[in-house]
Amino acid sequence: MAKSSFKLDHTLERRQAEANRIREKYSDRIPVIVEKAERSDIPDIDKKKYLVPADLTVGQFVYVVRKRIKLSPEKAIFIFVKNTLPPTAALMSAIYEENKDEDGFLYMTYSGENTFGLL
């Protein structure tokens, strides 16, 4: 997997400081970075950084991402954490605890494909 552009744009120290500040100020929220997968034909997302409620499910977060990229109903979207599809019913807090980066952020990648094969 290619290195996150967020990681390339910000030093580890800066990312750690920001994640720590966020977690101290909003202990019931999770700092998430969402980026489009390389070579995906799905639209770009308007913002990459999200402060997600800990009790939100992965499925609910997918809905948020879908709305942000204004994805048409016939298109599927897939969210990956470390190149793996997390269970839709899993809580974001559980995914965060298992997969957070050394900088304190949870990195998610999204990709899509046309589920109906329209020509």
UniProtKB/Swiss-Prot annotation:
The record marks G117, L118 as: Cleavage. GO terms for molecular function: phosphatidylethanolamine binding. Coiled coil: none annotated. It is found in: Cytoplasmic vesicle, Autophagosome membrane; Vacuole membrane; Cytoplasm, Cytoskeleton. The C-terminal 2 residues are removed by ATG4 to expose Gly-117 at the C-terminus. The C-terminal Gly is then amidated with phosphatidylethanolamine by an activating system similar to that for ubiquitin. The keyword Cytoplasm applies. It is a lipid-anchor. Keywords: Autophagy, Cytoplasm, Cytoplasmic vesicle, Cytoskeleton, Lipoprotein, Membrane, Microtubule, Protein transport, Transport, Ubl conjugation pathway, Vacuole. Signal peptide: none annotated. This is Autophagy-related protein 8B. The gene is ATG8B.
